[in-house]
């Protein structure tokens, strides 16, 4: 039996090895002209990996499936069951390497509908929590955050217009706006204020998100 040196390296404490971080986003979803279709997955992975590096918690990778409200039609998504089953796979294998607590960093609003099913995976010796970052779709905050992460094409911002790409702010997603008041309010805000790149705010938002998740990990130790 190998004696592992759990105290080695830049970590908060040896107990942090019992915490696993999972990224959750969406891989196949339109985000206008300036952001890639896997924006949510890349932002979630970027934050999760950086939190892992800072704290010493284990980065377990990203969930491949994602889900969405049935009336939001801007991408290709999976069932709640598909997402939960993939999380189960990561949790089961994470427990084999000594992980007892799991933090899911979710950066896709549609995935919040898994929360009730996710709670059922908790047990007395396995704790799972999901904390979500939900920004107005492909709009100012997400564009600026995408810039900070390094996935935004500034050249394509000139064409990043909700009148052309209806998924921006969900301005053109009529059914979603009719069925979800929060979506409609966000869409109206985008219609009134437009979409622009704020580089300073993007970097600040990214740092704040990373620091927030670092604190969550600290509280899980």
UniProtKB/Swiss-Prot annotation:
One of its GO terms (biological process) is riboflavin biosynthetic process. Its cofactor is Fe(2+); Zn(2+). Fe cation 1 binds at residues 29, 40, 108. It is an enzyme of class 3 (hydrolase). SUPFAM superfamilies: Creatininase. Fe cation 2 binds at residues 31, 40. GO terms for molecular function: 2-amino-5-formylamino-6-(5-phosphoribosylamino)pyrimidin-4(3H)-one formate-lyase activity; ferrous iron binding. Keywords: Hydrolase, Iron, Metal-binding, Zinc. Catalyzes the hydrolysis of the formamide of 2-amino-5-formylamino-6-ribosylamino-4(3H)-pyrimidinone 5'-monophosphate (FAPy) to form 2,5-diamino-6-ribosylamino-4(3H)-pyrimidinone 5'-phosphate (APy). Belongs to the creatininase superfamily. FAPy deformylase family. This is 2-amino-5-formylamino-6-ribosylaminopyrimidin-4(3H)-one 5'-monophosphate deformylase. It comes from Methanococcus maripaludis (strain DSM 14266 / JCM 13030 / NBRC 101832 / S2 / LL).
């Amino acid at each position: 039996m190998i004696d592992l040196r759990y105290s080695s390296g830049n970590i908060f404490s040896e107990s942090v090895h019992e915490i696993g971080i999972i990224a959750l986003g969406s891989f196949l979803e339109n985000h206008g002209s300036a952001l890639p279709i896997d924006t949510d997955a890349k932002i979630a992975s970027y934050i999760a990996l950086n939190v892992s590096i800072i704290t010493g918690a284990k980065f377990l990778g990203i969930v491949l499936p994602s889900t969405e409200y049935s009336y939001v039609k801007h991408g290709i998504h999976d069932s709640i069951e598909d997402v939960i089953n993939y999380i189960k796979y990561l949790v089961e294998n994470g427990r084999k390497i000594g992980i007892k607590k799991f933090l899911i960093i979710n950066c896709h609003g549609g995935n919040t509908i898994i929360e009730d099913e996710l709670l059922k995976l908790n047990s007395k010796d396995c704790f799972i929590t999901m904390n979500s970052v939900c920004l107005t779709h492909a709009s100012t905050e997400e564009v600026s955050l995408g810039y900070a992460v390094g996935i935004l094409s500034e050249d394509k911002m000139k064409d990043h217009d909700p009148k052309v790409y209806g998924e921006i702010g969900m301005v053109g997603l009529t059914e979603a706006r009719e069925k979800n008041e929060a979506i409609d309010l966000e869409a109206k805000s985008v219609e009134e204020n437009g979409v622009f790149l704020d580089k300073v705010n993007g970097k600040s938002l990214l740092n704040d998100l990373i620091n927030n998740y670092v604190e969550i990990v600290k509280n899980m130790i």
